[in-house]
A protein has these predicted regions:
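Short beta-to-alpha linker loops that shape the active-site pocket of alpha/beta-hydrolase fold enzymes
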Residues: 25, 30-34, 274
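C-terminal catalytic histidine-bearing segment of alpha/beta-hydrolase fold enzymes
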Residues: 212, 217-219, 260-322
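Short beta-strand/loop motif that positions the catalytic acidic residue
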Residues: 230, 235-242
Length: 322
């Protein structure tokens, strides 16, 4: 299975170029259930286990530093992108709240993360990649809490209900190849809403959208990152055009939550203009949903175009406090 210990991994390479090559000691851990972890599954977007995994990796790096001749300053900075943005924020929250004397947290840069998971359940339109990310989240939380559904067939339509609980994460197939091999619906001409409706039972989604005491909604609330007060400097970064983790649902809600308590140590940056200028045809986002350019642009926005711009913003914050 995939490991961030592989220097050829594109995310590892980006971290090496953006941070390690600039003098930072980078700790990039594999999560529970990946690589050499013996955990029985991956608790996807489970804030508490993300936090303990990241903090344990910092402890391990500190223990190993002297053996490789590294002198660490003791300053800790957290960053992550997408799921990693959720994990880095969960880690900063836990470090400041529970281990303030152990970790000298000086900054957190949380990039394109899904911080408002319960809010995202109430949005009527599906995200890009819904047929991958949402079943991943639902089956993970079912394994964590055991309450999300009583029978997999009440949540998922056939044939997906037959194998979805053991499909994700997949040791050999990624989102694209899961779709092209027919394990998940999708492909040219299939909209996110159509893909969602092929996978999920409509009653299951409607109940979650209603909120209240619905078990999926309650699980999402447990893993929201709203409502905490960071002590160190925080950067939120994303691109307004992101179709997978829309900032309107997550980044703006997170910033508004911080603002509601008068916090002055949080900045929020939108890199959409940079993404458009660099990757949009003629420097603008394509507007025709039926065009190949539209599919290419939005298909690459979250995973390829946006990350380097947000990591550059993160490093600027870290450079100011290192």
């Amino acid at each position: 299975t995939r490991t961030l210990a592989n220097p050829q991994d594109s995310e590892t390479f980006l971290l090496a170029a953006m941070y390690a090559a600039q003098g930072y000691a980078v700790v990039a851990t594999d999560y529970l259930g990946f690589a050499k972890s013996t955990y029985g599954y991956h608790p996807y977007l489970h804030a508490d286990s993300e936090a303990t995994t990241v903090l344990d990796s910092v402890r391990a790096a500190r223990a190993a530093a002297s053996s490789v001749g590294a002198n660490l300053s003791g300053k800790v900075m957290f960053t992550g992108y997408s799921q990693g943005g959720h994990a880095s924020m969960a880690a900063q929250r836990a470090a400041e709240r529970d281990y303030g004397t152990e970790f000298n947290v000086v900054a957190g840069a949380h990039l394109a993360g899904p911080y408002n998971l319960s809010g995202s359940l109430r949005v009527p339109d599906a995200i890009a990649g819904v047929q991958f990310f949402v079943p991943y989240l639902v089956t993970s939380w079912q394994k964590v809490y055991g309450t999300v559904y009583t029978d997999v067939k009440t949540a998922f339509k056939t044939p997906y209900s037959d194998y979805i609980e053991s499909l994700l994460p997949n040791p050999t197939l990624n989102y694209t190849t899961l779709v092209t091999t027919g394990k998940l619906p999708g492909g040219p001409g299939v909209t996110p809403n159509q893909a969602r409706d092929l996978v999920f039972q409509p009653e299951f989604l409607a109940a979650a959208q209603a909120g209240g005491s619905n078990p999926l909604f309650v699980a999402a609330q447990k893993n929201d990152l709203l409502g905490w007060n960071p002590k160190a400097r925080v950067l939120l970064c994303g691109g307004a055009g992101d179709p997978t983790v829309p900032p309107a649902i997550h980044q703006r809600a997170m910033k508004a939550d911080f603002d509601s308590r008068g916090l002055t140590n949080v900045a929020s940056v939108d890199v959409d203009a940079l993404v458009q200028a660099t990757y949009g045809p003629g420097g603008k986002a394509p507007t025709d949903p039926a065009s190949a350019a539209f599919a290419t642009y939005y298909g690459n926005y979250h995973g390829t175009y946006e990350p380097p711009f947000c990591h550059a913003q993160a490093r600027a914050v870290f450079d100011a406090v290192k």
